[in-house]
Amino acid sequence: MRDLKTYLSVAPVLSTLWFGSLAGLLIEINRLFPDALTFPFF
């Protein structure tokens, strides 16, 4: 039961950090390549 409580307290923190970094990455991509419907990498 203690492991379940540890998991339930760690999962929101990790998901917040993951989605925050993903949002920051998308914001930076949109800042460098504005209005890109297809990524001009290839």
Swiss-Prot record:
Protein topology in the membrane: Single-pass membrane protein
Gene this protein is translated from: psaJ
Disulfide bonds: none
Domain of life according to the entry: Eukaryota
Keyword annotations from UniProtKB, A to Z: Chloroplast, Membrane, Photosynthesis, Photosystem I, Plastid, Thylakoid, Transmembrane, Transmembrane helix
The protein, known as: Photosystem I reaction center subunit IX
Pfam families: PSI_PsaJ (PF01701)
GO cellular component labels: chloroplast thylakoid membrane; photosystem I
Residues that span the membrane, as ranges: 7-27
Subcellular location: Plastid, Chloroplast thylakoid membrane
Organism: Lepidium virginicum
SUPFAM superfamilies for this protein: Subunit IX of photosystem I reaction centre, PsaJ (SSF81544)
